[in-house]
Amino acid sequence: MVTARDLFDFAGTFMEREFNGAERPWDVLGRIKAFLEEHLKPEIKGTVHPTAVVEPDVFLDEGVVVEPGAFIQGPTWIGKGSSVRQGAYIRGKTVVGAGCIVGHATEVKNAVFLDGAKAGHFAYVGDSILGKGVNLGAGTKLANFKLDAGNVILHADGQRIDTGLRKFGALLGNGVQTGCNSVTSPGCVVGPECWIYANTTVPNGIYEGHQILCSEGRRITSRRRR
């Protein structure tokens, strides 16, 4: 079974305890609210444009920039030097690390961005975790809800794993890159340093790291390690 350590470098990060305590990596999604209730102290240290809306129960660290028309609901915690760009919509229960981007027309809810993760343009990040240095190409959607409204079941190695979650988008390991208009189906666990090509729909499942995923198949080739 994949673990949080297989996907993410979280040592010394703001949610290290939550990651360490999770039996399964997607269990962290259910810990976000409790983490914020325990640690969040609302304060605005960054810069907020007058036309942006920042509701109560939000922490913005030093160097955070919130651009015109952005809307941030609480509870939300945003780390140093991150940007919330024009028209972004953060719907609460969100933890954003340092040097991250929540981009133009991007919607985020119940999610974690580890340091340096970027969702720059027209993305949907719901009930998901982005590892360090993840970059989502424009229009990337991390779908989080099944058409039958049932629990998300992971299909991997011939097994059916009930996650216990009705809403579960994707876990993208450190360094994952997605091309424009790519989509992950509800319940995608993608290992570190994978590339997802543009216009690809990734089926539900657990994917090892250092792979290239494209619309012609689940696994095309292994990437050469840098």
Where are the language model's segments positioned?
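N-terminal short leaders/motifs
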Residues: 3-23, 57, 69, 75, ...
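Short loop/turn microsegments at loop-to-beta-strand junctions
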Residues: 55-56, 61, 73-74, 92, ...
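Extended, compositionally simple hydrophobic/Ser/Thr-rich segments
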Residues: 66-68, 72-77, 82-112, 116-121, ...
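Glycine-rich hexapeptide-repeat left-handed beta-helix
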Residues: 15-19, 104, 110-116, 120-226
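Long amphipathic N-terminal alpha/beta scaffold segment
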Residues: 31-77
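Terminal amphipathic alpha-helical/low-complexity segments used for targeting or macromolecular assembly
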Residues: 1-51, 193, 208-226
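ABC ATPase A-loop
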Residues: 59, 77, 95, 171, ...
